[in-house]
Amino acid sequence: MIQERADIEKAYASNLRKFAARLEMFLRTGVEYGTATNILSGLAKEAEDNAELHSNIAAGLINPVQLGIKNWQRENFHKSSISTSIKEVKNFDSEFENAQKTWYKHYKNVNRCKKEYFHACKTVRSLQVQVQNAKNEPFGTPEQQAQRGKELRKMEDKLRKGIMEEEKTRKAYEEAISSLSDVTPRYIEDMTQVFNKAQAFERERIVYFKEQALQMQAVLDISAKPNLSQIFVELRETVAKVDADADLKKWSLAYGVDMAPNFPVFQEYSPEMSALGKKGRSALADGSSGGVTLTSLKTFTSPDRGGPIPGTTDSGSNISTSPVHTTDYTSSVNGAAAAVSKEKQRVEDTPPYPDFVDDGRPGVPIRALYDYVGVEADELSFNSGDLFEKLEDEDEQGWCKGRKDGRVGLYPRQLR
């Protein structure tokens, strides 16, 4: 019974943890954003905390409640080595049997004498009726009268013997009752002694199980748990932090009318720029090509044209621009590690590309077979063994679209 209740608590805790895990997984998809994520994270934490609470209840039912009962049973109920019966029960049966052994012998004798006496009485009553009927029959021929006379004498003789047997059995029955009465006080005394002993043993059992039931009640009384109210206080405080206006403003700054403008500006053609486009991504990902990677390009500004818009970034070609003099055209060539470091920092400060906004569609779970560090803002970074989702198959340049930790971006199908 206790084990069954503990299993119920364990199953409830397990279901709460599964529910919390699904909420956490939904949070990682990035569908919800801003302070509204507090709702899901708060519910997930409440489920985890309640799961822990009910896991502790299940553990408390097993130890000390169930374990204590099992130990008490081992100490007070011992199984026989030759049978499945309990030794204590068998001992009580033997003591009761010994206490009533003498009395029971007299009791059986009383029942036997009673049966014989009742049978003798029944026989006498039957013979009396037969004799009376024989005397009342009409007279017939002399021969018939002589025959009935003989039969009547036989019945009267049987009746006399029956009456004598009735007296004999009556006397035996009375003596048996008297003998039984003589041993009855001792029988009552012995039976009372054994019965009181059994009652004391049973009282000990009931008192112990009452104590264990009260302990079980204390374990199950969830209202008395000090951290129960705190769980829901924290949930309420977490949900209260949701700010719709702040979330809408943040979304507008990132994707709406309040976002920083990023309009195209004139850029002078350079052959190296082709390595930064989507057509040249395979070369950018190849660290063994022996070439160099163009990581920064400052715009050449004609004397008769104004400078580019300060702080703008061309997301299509991954080129940062800033107002410089005409002769200030330079290209910075660094090692792969330095380029990765600079690009990772720039990714954190650059709004996501419109083509890579998470629309919430389901993806195909995949596991990375290699390490890759995204060079551009629209690329994903991952380590070998990481799990993420594939959203689109490989394009003609060998790039796939995927989602990792709620962020959508590109990754190479394989390193070349």
From Swiss-Prot:
Q: Name one GO cellular component term.
A: plasma membrane
Q: Which Pfam families match?
A: SH3_1
User: Which domain of life does this protein belong to?
Assistant: Eukaryota
Q: Which GO terms describe its molecular function?
A: phospholipid binding
Instruction: Locate the compositionally biased regions of type Polar residues.
Output: 312-327
Which residues are in the SH3 domain?
361-416
List every stretch annotated Disordered: 297-327
Q: What name does the UniProt record give this protein?
A: Antigen EG13
Give the source species. Answer: Echinococcus granulosus
- State the taxonomy lineage: Eukaryota, Metazoa, Spiralia, Lophotrochozoa, Platyhelminthes
Name the gene behind this protein: EG13
